[in-house]
Amino acid sequence: MPCAMLVAAAVEVAVPTLAEAAALGAIGAILAGPLMQPTKVRSPVRVRNSNLKCHGTKMRSPSMVSMSQSQRIKIPSYVGLSTVHTPALLTPVISSRSTRTFQKTAKTIQERSHAVMQIPEFTPGTGLRSTNAIQRTTEVLQRHSHVGLRQPHAGRLREMHTASGRPVIGLTPTIVSQKTTKVPKQPRFVARAIDNFSREVMNAIAVAHDEAQYIAHLTIGSTNILLSLISQYICIFLLEIILNKAYKMFRAAVRRATRGAKLATLMEYGTNLTKLAEEGKLDPVVGRQKQIDHVVQILSRRTKNNPCLIGEPGVGKTAIAEGLAQLIATGDVPETIQQKTVISLDMGLLLAGTKYRGELEERLKNILEEIKQNGEIILFLDEVHTLVTAGSAEGAIDAANIFKPALARGELQCIGATTINEYRKHIEKDAALERRFQPVKIPESTVDETVGILKGLRERYQGHHKVQYTDEALVAAAELSHKHIRDRFLPDKAIDLMDEAGSIVRLRNAQCKPSKKVNDLEAELKKTLKEKNDAISIQNFRRAKQLRDHELQLRTNISALTDKKTQMMEPDAIAMPVVTEDDVRHAISRWTGVPLHKVSMDESRKLLKLEEALHRRVVGQGEAVAAVSRAIRRARLGLKHPGRPVASLVFAGPTGVGKSELAKALAAYYYGSSESEEAAMVRLDMSEYMEKHAVARLVGSPPGYVWHGEGGQLTEAVRRRPHAVVLLDEVEKAHRDVFDLLLQVLDDGRLTDGKGRTVDFKNTLIVMTTNIGSSLIVNNGGDGAAAAGRIKNTVTDEMKRHFRPEFLNRLDEVIMFQPLTELEVGKIAGIMLEEFAGRVREKGIKLKVTDKFRELVVEEGFDPSYGARPLRRAVVRLLEDTLAEKMLAGEVREGDSVIVDADSAGNAVVRRSNAMPA
């Protein structure tokens, strides 16, 4: 019986059977070696006198140890197993029982043999194919004199090309030829006697027979023969091929299953934007298609394929990276990046916790190694300029130098994002890093583009705030934010404005306040719980039971009231509140302090009566009051020039006629409140800026000077209060360079401070006071239009000699303040006395002045050359000083009512009202 027939028949086993056998036995033994202690693994068939062990380490290939009675043979690796073993070593000693079994089986086979040797009793489905294999093998065996297990399986391999005869995993005729040791050719002779069978064949048939009986098979199948050969470590090259192939398949499956584990460091310090896009957790990206296409084009390069997004804060640099992740998730990208994954690396998280030198470098190297092994990662670095200084210390290198080699070779695909200033400050200084990034400029969105972006985000914000946005509200958010929020950029500021308007409307329409009945029940429940605990502590369980029942009843009542209120609110919840254009205007008014909401009826009446309100504090000067009122009305109704301040006025006139007082009255009445007029007015005394070096204090000191970085006194105040009155008092005393600085403010409504920030003056009312020509006004004073025209021409000529033409040409109006008449001074005296009476009333003293005393004050305080300031000094001397002496002497106490009068000598007389003569 030629044993090659057995091998040829054994190779007939189909692939699934071999895969099952390998998985149950060899794979488990070999691949489990590196993961656990050496373990004895049972062969897939019941093998006698044979065990299989595996030993392995983390870095070396697992090894097999075959045990055959007293012989121990170590197989160091999978490759070339058959070359290190000989048949003599691999053949176990045949027991007497095995010999008898073999002789019986061989006799049966010989009795059924035909002219050409064949084994007809194979398992159905394989017998015919095995018979053909034996016939093919006979031709090969005729060249050999000894029948063993090392003859090539040529007969079987000729049948492998058909579908029903698929080869064993990885087994080809070439491999078999290479793995089989050649036997020298002998004269053509086919051994038929049993003596010519080798001991390997005898033992293999015996084991196959035993296994067939063990599993209740009536015949010996090819599966039994093959597993018998492998279990006896005969035909070891078949086991080598099967295990190598299965090991590769298993490693591939493990690699796929542990792909996420291999990105452990990257996932610890990063965020998978592609996964978030697949889950729908990213906001939709509207527009920016041109910039995204440019990024994809750079990513498709072979080397230096690293785009760097450069733009101002808030223009949408991060949104472009998220948009790319969304396109990859939906597959709407070229095939060059279809399988890529966008991961955002958090540099702050990467740097956190690096206590010792080298920890940051180790994290970065692990990240780069994971990216290199994966090969499908696009790394997004927001604020990429932090790479330049991250980790830099004495004796260490920064993160940028670690990234540079990978960026240049194309091993790392990175999308950076930074601002224009940071790019110039950090990236451009490092020429080696700059050449590895390809800049992509991200401009600020236009108003129309911003409206489209807001419409794309509308659904997300409606779901969050439970409101509805009208198209007019979105347009207003884009336009108003672009117009009134100057220190930020679109679309970020428009999105924030839309978000804030939604939150305002939601809170305004919220009906979550509990009713009074619910509050009373909750208070009673709290009291009941306390009494129950006290009863339990003193072991009064009867009382505790009663309180517990009362507690349950209270909870039921509270729940019923709450559910009823929820049901009543359900119809309102369906009809969600609507965010309108006026809601957006209210939101930006809260944000900037500029009144942009529509003019209400109350405010309309307030604007129409603005002159009357101002005249309560400012006596006379009708022209100035009217000019200021007209400017306020234009600005409030949106009719003023959008690129200039509300108004730029010069109040010219003699001292003490109410120039500064008018600005204060305007700030108190319209821009602020009467209690705090200073909060709505930016006042600068220009006498403090007489020196040339003091001019820089208006906008901030330049680098290298004291107070650099503190902000300018003018620019910083307007940045904090953009809707205010800017009063430049006694402007003619300032240095001439101050007027050059104000040219840009008067014409364009903007000014750049010492830190490079642009300050918006478009919502300010600029008032400058001057005393130029005051002596001429006093000397040429008089009544009538002729005198007023003569004074105006005189003052205008004087101002032309003092100020430059470009400064005067940018002023809206120069208003002349006339000297005060005695009648106007009397009215001012009444205002001052009423103001003093209000201060004394806070001390508990009721004050009343007579007409005689008022005339005395006007007589001593009137001076046409000095205006109303002498009047204030007269009030202080005649009234305040006299009343203070009486209070110190005890003649006037808290709660008294006093009357102030004047005697015939022109002195003030203070007496209590109950001491007055009848």
UniProtKB/Swiss-Prot annotation:
Keyword terms: ATP-binding, Chaperone, Chloroplast, Nucleotide-binding, Plastid, Repeat, Transit peptide
Taxonomic lineage: Eukaryota, Viridiplantae, Streptophyta, Embryophyta, Tracheophyta
Span list, region II: 579-774
CC terms in the record's Gene Ontology section: chloroplast
SUPFAM superfamilies assigned to the protein according to its UniProt record, in alphabetical order: P-loop containing nucleoside triphosphate hydrolases
Binding site residues for ATP: 311-318, 653-660
Keyword Chloroplast listed: yes
UniProt function note: Molecular chaperone that may interact with a ClpP-like protease involved in degradation of denatured proteins in the chloroplast.
Protein known as: Chaperone protein ClpC4, chloroplastic
GN (gene name): CPLC4
Keyword Signal: no
Gene3D superfamilies with a match to the protein in the record: 1.10.8.60, P-loop containing nucleotide triphosphate hydrolases (3.40.50.300), UVR domain (4.10.860.10)
Organism of origin: Oryza sativa subsp. japonica
Coarse class of the protein's main subcellular location: plastid
